């Protein structure tokens, strides 16, 4: 049987994160698939190529934004927006977002592919207008800043930012609703995202949790758990590191914050001697922290959340709010505990109570690590391949 011709559409390759890791696994699932993204930076391109190469022999080289990457079957196609992104310094991509939907609607997909798989945050589903082939959307989240007013206000940072994001949000909602009826199938990365797809798009979704590179994170029983809790991740408002800091202060504990971002300066003003900021750090430092902390704190609501799974792969329990992607990953009494979701005061008090009474000896690190194994890339590739094959008919 002839292998299907698959196109993969992502919104941008300007940095490497969880959604780019998903695309890397897409490429391993469908070798030779063409990859399209309106905005591609050199760093973003090279990070994707390295991630794909890590799962097979040979590392493809960079020959421009539209290339067949060193015989590895990866062709990455961008647009004029890549050059515009470089011209404005290669930093923030937000000024280019209004041009992304039109660019996606003009992708050269017609009559070239049997199925198109899009990796969607806000605009990728616009590719549905560029082809008559079945389009299957893997949704990291419907544009949360577009649909959720509270989230938008939290992220915008001041009145001018709120106005700009409100306008862009209206634009994104219209784009998503226009594309949704034409999708052949929707796959959500968590049950919380599936609920958003149902409520905002009016569509059902199959849940396939994203892959987590747990091979990089393993337990070490010879390393004892120490007397500190860990927050790891980008220091941006919605991650709610501020709640972790306040909860540890309330409980009289110690906290290590691993990560960096625009919210760090504010966080340092509310933290005291109980909190240590390590900044951004390589994997070996993160691994060491996962192995030594009493537990990882997850006070923010994530669409999925990679950090809890990485921590559990190292045998570390996770204390998380009972909302969002944590409902897919944390098992109370086995791999961690939930804090009842509520306002900031309730979350801080609930997490402080867990911290005060927390006893890591109640949890089996080996069982926690085995649970994390269910999110391994091999499991993801098997599930996504099966779901797409059935949806594409």
Regions found by a protein language model. Name each.
Residues 265-288:
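Nucleotide-activated donor-binding/catalytic signature segment of Leloir-type glycosyltransferases, i.e.
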Residues 297, 317-322, 330:
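Short hydrophobic beta-strand element within catalytic cores of glycosyltransferases
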Residues 29-125:
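Active-site donor-binding segments of glycosyltransferases and PAPS-dependent sulfotransferases
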Residues 98, 342, 359-389:
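A charged, aromatic-enriched C-terminal amphipathic alpha-helix characteristic of glycosyltransferases
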Residues 154-186, 194-195:
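Membrane-proximal helix-turn-helix segments that form the acceptor-binding/catalytic region
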Residues 291-303, 316:
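Acidic donor-binding loop of glycosyltransferase active sites
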Residues 279, 332-333, 337-346, 354-362:
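Conserved acidic donor-binding segment of nucleotide-sugar-dependent glycosyltransferases
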Residues 220-256:
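Conserved donor-binding/catalytic core segment of Leloir-type glycosyltransferases
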């Amino acid at each position: 049987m002839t292998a299907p011709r698959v196109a993969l559409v992502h919104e941008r390759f300007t940095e490497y994160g969880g959604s780019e890791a998903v695309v890397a696994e897409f490429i391993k699932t469908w070798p030779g698939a063409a990859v399209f993204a309106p905005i591609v930076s050199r760093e973003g391109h090279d990070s994707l190529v390295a991630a794909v190469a890590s799962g097979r022999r040979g590392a493809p080289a960079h020959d421009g934004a539209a290339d067949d990457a060193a015989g590895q079957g990866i062709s990455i196609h961008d647009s004029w927006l890549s050059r515009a992104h470089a011209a404005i310094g290669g930093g923030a991509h937000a000024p280019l977002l209004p041009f992304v939907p039109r660019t996606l609607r003009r992708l050269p997909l017609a009559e070239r592919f049997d199925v198109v798989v899009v990796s969607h945050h806000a605009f990728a589903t616009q590719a549905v207008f560029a082809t008559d082939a079945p389009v299957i959307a893997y949704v990291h989240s419907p544009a949360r800043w577009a649909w959720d007013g509270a989230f938008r206000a939290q992220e915008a940072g001041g009145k001018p930012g709120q106005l700009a994001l409100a306008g862009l949000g209206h634009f994104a909602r219209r784009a998503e609703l226009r594309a949704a009826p034409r999708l052949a199938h929707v796959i959500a990365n968590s049950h919380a995202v599936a609920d958003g797809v149902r409520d905002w798009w009016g569509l059902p979704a199959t849940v396939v949790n994203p892959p987590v590179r747990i091979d990089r994170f393993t337990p070490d029983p010879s390393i004892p758990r120490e007397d500190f809790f860990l927050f790891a991740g980008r220091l941006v408002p919605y991650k709610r590191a501020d709640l972790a800091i306040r909860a540890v202060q309330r409980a009289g504990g110690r906290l290590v914050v691993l990560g960096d971002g625009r919210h760090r300066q504010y966080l340092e003003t509310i933290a005291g001697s109980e909190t240590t900021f390590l900044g951004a750090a390589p994997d070996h430092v993160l691994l060491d922290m996962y192995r030594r902390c009493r537990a990882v704190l997850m006070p923010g609501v994530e669409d999925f959340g990679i950090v809890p799974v990485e921590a559990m792969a190292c045998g570390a329990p996770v204390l998380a709010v009972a909302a969002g992607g944590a409902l897919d990953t944390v098992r109370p009494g086995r791999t961690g505990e939930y804090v009842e979701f509520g306002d900031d005061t309730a979350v801080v008090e609930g997490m402080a109570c867990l911290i005060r009474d927390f006893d890591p000896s109640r949890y089996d690190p080996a069982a926690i690590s085995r649970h994390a194994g269910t999110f391994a890339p091999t499991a993801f590739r098997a599930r996504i391949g099966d779901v797409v094959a059935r949806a594409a008919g």
